[in-house]
């Protein structure tokens, strides 16, 4: 940043979640430095905030080994071109938003040229492939972390890291309105309500839906008024779930929802879900939950040897204890899942204690992440 040149921030986002983060960061930076320039790889939200897109985000948004191999030459070309063009531009700071396989190497290339680099959103190095932390440390001047235990991990390896809180915690109210959510979904206020969230990936829906449906059948025996809501992320997952339900529980009445996962969580007395970001969202919705997860035996065997954490769900990792029940592999079966959910549906001491802890954890990670990220960028730019 000079008197002649405005503050120039280069950014690369590789998927929709990164585009949302990038847009929030740009917005917060523009409030402080209205004439700042933003360039790089951007999605529609970042572009709407004024980011100049050298490449469209969709160019990087490839998933799966086969897809990546098919696009490898193009991806390597883009990374080489960005290394050259950012090297010539000499931005005040480069921010790589998530997409670690693409961004961390790019960050390293730019850091060697004297450009200050930030990696926004820590990869799960604390959970597996922990040696990646050394590459991240060499490639970046700063990591921006959503969760406090991530910062503790980086501190252990002397890698500069700033805990900024989680954008999802900023976006969700501390005290959600359950009755308003029920009105939206058409659920009576006095009914018992269970949310089933069998995952967003095809493999998860295939592995979990049958057990989740059988669990709901068992719970309906105890709670005949039980309303069951099943939010599904897209038409493919809905079609897949409907096929499995027709085979396993054709007579079980459920509310199938297109998206609306957050509304389903807020409306429900309890949720049965696959692990992942959904568990964090469910915690922020203050919905007591049980995590059920199953994968192919070899994958599970491998995961047990690679994963270095005691828990798989983010609420438990945040709490540092088994706050929510995790039933994995052979434990993920209808009788055990139903037994774990029954006390939560009763809305007694168990669910009230869980709700209170969820609220405390929400407050811990509700730090105005966009503003914190913007402050970190400006401090590094000076």
Curated annotation (Swiss-Prot):
Condensation of UDP-2,3-diacylglucosamine and 2,3-diacylglucosamine-1-phosphate to form lipid A disaccharide, a precursor of lipid A, a phosphorylated glycolipid that anchors the lipopolysaccharide to the outer membrane of the cell. HAMAP family: LpxB. Belongs to the LpxB family. It comes from the Bacteria. GO terms for cellular component: membrane. This is Lipid-A-disaccharide synthase. It catalyses: 2-N,3-O-bis[(3R)-3-hydroxytetradecanoyl]-alpha-D-glucosaminyl 1-phosphate + UDP-2-N,3-O-bis[(3R)-3-hydroxytetradecanoyl]-alpha-D-glucosamine = lipid A disaccharide (E. coli) + UDP + H(+); a lipid X + a UDP-2-N,3-O-bis[(3R)-3-hydroxyacyl]-alpha-D-glucosamine = a lipid A disaccharide + UDP + H(+). NCBIfam families: lpxB. Keywords: Glycosyltransferase, Lipid A biosynthesis, Lipid biosynthesis, Lipid metabolism, Transferase. Pathway: Glycolipid biosynthesis; lipid IV(A) biosynthesis; lipid IV(A) from (3R)-3-hydroxytetradecanoyl-[acyl-carrier-protein] and UDP-N-acetyl-alpha-D-glucosamine: step 5/6. It comes from Escherichia coli (strain 55989 / EAEC). One of its GO terms (biological process) is lipid A biosynthetic process. Its EC number is 2.4.1.182. The lineage of its organism: Bacteria, Pseudomonadati, Pseudomonadota, Gammaproteobacteria, Enterobacterales. GO terms for molecular function: lipid-A-disaccharide synthase activity; phospholipid binding.
